[in-house]
Amino acid sequence: NLNPDDINIYRQLSGGVTSSHILHGSANTIGGQTQLIKLRWGANDQDLKFAGADPFIKFALGENVKRSSSTQGNPRFPDSRMGVDQVLMDAFQRATDYQNSLKAAGTKGTVRKDLELDALSEIMNKKRFITCHSYVQSEINAMMKVGDKYGFTVNTFTHILEGYKVADKMKAHGANVSTFSDWWNYKMEVVDAIPYNAYIMQKVGLNVAINSDDAEMARRLNQEAAKIVKYGGLTEEEVWKMVTINPAKMMHVDKQTGSIKVGKDADLVLWSDNPLSIYAKAEKTIVDGIIYFDREKDAAMRKLNQAEKARIIAKLTAAKR
């Protein structure tokens, strides 16, 4: 479930974020549902959800899947990239057989309902969309081959730090890509990462976004995008799209948000400077036309909190005497 009390919702508003795609971890090849939310601080869990957004599902490839249980002394399949590929092939074949059985049964209802296979069937019928944790070119190619065989497109490859090696193939497949700006060498499968990755994928013609994967970095995505101006020389407008309209397109909500246009949701940020500057601060963050973060009011609340804290401490100190 979503936690509407998570302080990171407010902190990300303070960094100029209006929407966020919430995903679970990457221990399983085929994971669970994801959730697109708007950062409506103070709302309950249901009201955080982005109304009308398409359903997505988290997939994962590579080291995280391979090592998720073996490090705990409980090895399990899959324990290799080939095993991960086989998990995918087996799952979608079962889903294909399941759909065929449902069609054959017609209205008789003789096929036992399977929620896992229902989700995979939604993917093949373009009713649910994949966000896939990925790094290495071999596994990216393998994932696309599974999609081609079973008639679906991987909507988004996330992290995708070897994306520059297979950008042309991902474009032909129809995928979007969401990557880090300059992360490198934090595990073995990232050793070939380069800071020009986003630039190269953009030039090939992919729809590129910058992702955070971290609550702290999520409120600094403006600075992460700015790095791509240095690494590749894209224009400021091109890199700004990587944290605005491009991710909105990936999530199929670009008709509602991601740019300033008559008829779209009033999701806006007032910056103190060029938002790509390291000196820029979000002065006001507006979601659906409502101001959810105001820097002046935030400063005033902090003063009140400090004064109240001092009063309570003084009272406790006096009581001890």
What is each model feature region?
Residues 2-6, 78-82, 137, 192, ...:
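Soluble non-cytosolic domains of exported or imported proteins
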Residues 5-154, 281, 287, 316-320:
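Polyanionic/metal-chelating signatures
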Residues 32, 47-49, 165-168, 186-194, ...:
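Short, charged, surface-exposed secondary-structure boundary motifs
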Residues 84, 296-321:
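Intein/HINT protein-splicing elements and their conserved insertion hotspots or analogous self-processing inserts
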Residues 129, 168-171, 175-271, 291:
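His/Asp/Glu-enriched, well-ordered alpha-helical/loop segment
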Residues 131-135, 153-162, 182-187:
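Catalytic beta/alpha-barrel core
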Residues 137-139, 160-165, 245-248:
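Short acidic loop-to-helix transition motifs that present clustered carboxylates
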Residues 261-305:
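C-terminal cap of metal-dependent C-N hydrolases
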